[in-house]
Amino acid sequence: MTEMFELNYINYLFSEKTSVTLRQMELIAEGKRTPSTLFTAEKNQLQALFLSSLSLSKSEWVDRMKKLSDLGWLTQEEGRYQITPSGQQSKKAFILNYPLLNCTLEMSDALTRKEFWHWFIFVTQILSEFSYGNKGYIPYISDRLTQNRIKKWLAEQGFPQKPLAVMWADEIKAFLETLPDELGTFIVNQMIGHNYEGMTKRQTAEKHGMTSLEVLLTTEILMDRLSRFFEESDLLKSLWDTVHKSCHYGLSDSAYRSMTFLMNGSSIHSTAAIRKLKENTVKEHVLEAVLISKYTGYKPLIPKEVYDQLRKLFLSEPSLSYAQAQQEIQQLEFFWYRLVEIERIRGCL
């Protein structure tokens, strides 16, 4: 059952536009932030695989892809895997059986979804124990740095802890009421509070008849859904925003630092000099921000005449290669080409 769910999930990730090697799948799942890996995820619509809960070794990837090929769901041509009509039918059936998957997961939120769950559980524990005047509990999160960040967030809310606990409970209740009973119970069973130890992931899997991967995916998707339930949830929104910032909005630490300079008006050259990096490294950071966080302030980094030429070329030939573009535009930087190519893929030209 565990392996069959994995196979269905991997097959679900494929679309008609997906054509990838096994190694590319592996790198995307690991959350590698190189421009080439991120671009592969974008081009092949594999954003949901980025930093995935699907944790497989190289040999396990080989095994799963072989089994998917044997099932006739995927086909392999020159080392690249593509979904077959049979695979598309299996994907539709899988979504019908697991409708939570019928959603869009952004790469920028991949780490935030995971971290937010832990902050969410810990804040619930803190406020629950406070309500009963208990200071002698074992904290859900043992890391001191994270503990201090959460305590700082609680202090910044501007409410005494007692009314804060009531507000928190009300917001959680309102969110749970939007879910089917089974999913609401799924969350509540894992929560921690005064004299209440939530279930472990293993216990949750047994209780709900799920695989371990299904528990992780369900948790992430519910946290993503929670992040969209903010119109009447000031505390939950504030916590999400704080976690998202602590996760550098999905960027690597180095890319986040470079983008901070660039967004404050620094040039690529100046940013590279200040940070003692190569200019190409800063350009890679820009591509990371565009691909992960959908940063849109990059156009001033492309000479206008070059941008206009590239746009015209892509409109006439959507599959335009860098080599072809170089024949039309002298001294064309790959960085400029890639930025406009991303626009073309996203339908923004």
Regions found by a protein language model. Name each.
Residues L226-V243, S293-Q309, C348-L349:
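Short Lys/Arg-enriched helix C-cap and helix-to-coil transition segments
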Residues P99-L176:
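Exposed, interaction-prone assembly regions rather than primary DNA-binding/catalytic cores
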Residues E60-T75, I221-M223, A289, R344:
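Basic amphipathic alpha-helical segments that dock to polyanions
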Residues M25, Q203-E206, T271-A273, S321-E328:
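Short alpha-helical "recognition helix" segments of helix-turn-helix
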Residues N8-E16, G184-G198, L251-S266, V306-P318:
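Short, amphipathic alpha-helical "recognition" segments used to contact nucleic acids or chromatin
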Residues T75-E115:
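Accessory beta->alpha helical hairpin/"wing" motif in late/C-terminal subdomains of nucleic-acid enzymes
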Residues K66-G79, R228-E231, Y295, I345-L349:
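A short, conserved structural fragment
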Residues M1-L56, N148, K152-K162:
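Short, amphipathic alpha-helical interface elements at domain boundaries
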